């Protein structure tokens, strides 16, 4: 089982959380945001997921064991986060426009997720339309 964290509790992070809950190979163990009053954190609590409003500070203060972090924040914060997670040995799947790691399109180069410390997912439009090219 892959142990995952999500940082960013807005629409993208929350949608991702709901998808991860349904998988049988990824266990979302922490959902990190900035406000306990956010709709995403409230929903995660209802689903029994551990939450925090400490954002990146939670990961700095708590060396919890996760295999991968999904960064659903913004490009500016993702650049700061990438350094912290690299020091901790945590793989990053970046869903922001930061373009820190190699671009990853699972239908084209799925091996990037296994071989790189940080991968940047292309836009949702790109992810959705790429299979049409095959």
Language-model regions, residue ranges each:
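Rossmann-fold NAD(P)-binding glycine/threonine-rich loop
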Residues: 76-122
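Glycine-rich adenosine-cofactor-binding loop
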Residues: 3-16
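Short acidic-hydrophobic, aromatic-tinged amphipathic segments that line or gate anion-handling sites
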Residues: 50-58
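Beta-loop-alpha module in the N-terminal Rossmann-like domain of NAD(P)-dependent dehydrogenases
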Residues: 59-60, 64-85
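Short active-site oxyanion
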Residues: 2-3, 27-30, 66-69
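NAD(P)-binding Rossmann-fold cofactor-contacting core
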Residues: 23-47
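Oxidoreductase and adenylate-handling cofactor-binding alpha/beta cores
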Residues: 128-134
